[in-house]
Amino acid sequence: MLLLRTEVSYNDPPAAKPLIRNLIMKKLSKVQEKQQALVLTVADKLEAQAREEIPGMMLCWFDVEYHLFPGSLILFFQFEDEQSLEAAKPELLKWQKRLSAAMLKKGVILKDMRKHLTFTLQGPED
């Protein structure tokens, strides 16, 4: 299982993001690199929007098995505490739709949008 988890944050300086990502990723094929770039672009965009709109949202990270892409893609919005997580749960469907729309704009169809984004308290290392 090829597992990609990134701790690169929206707050990191833009010049540092590629360096951090290169340190924590395994060697990928050219096709997988394109898939990864697409997912990172969408994840960064959604993370920026979510930080502005959802109180307590800390980090967006993802998990994917490239040989099963896009079916295996799952984005996680990590929250500071249980209270902010519970307050954000009514917004989950809206963010799942945003992910689906953003991926569709990039030419990737997510068949069941509800499986590809979740809210959590766990981080990438948990």
What do the PLM-derived regions correspond to, one by one?
Residues 19-45:
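N-terminal presequence-like segments and adjacent domain-start helices
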Residues 55-78:
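Short edge beta-strands and adjacent turn/loop segments
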Residues 4-24:
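Short, Lys/Arg-enriched N-terminal segments with co-localized hydrophobic residues
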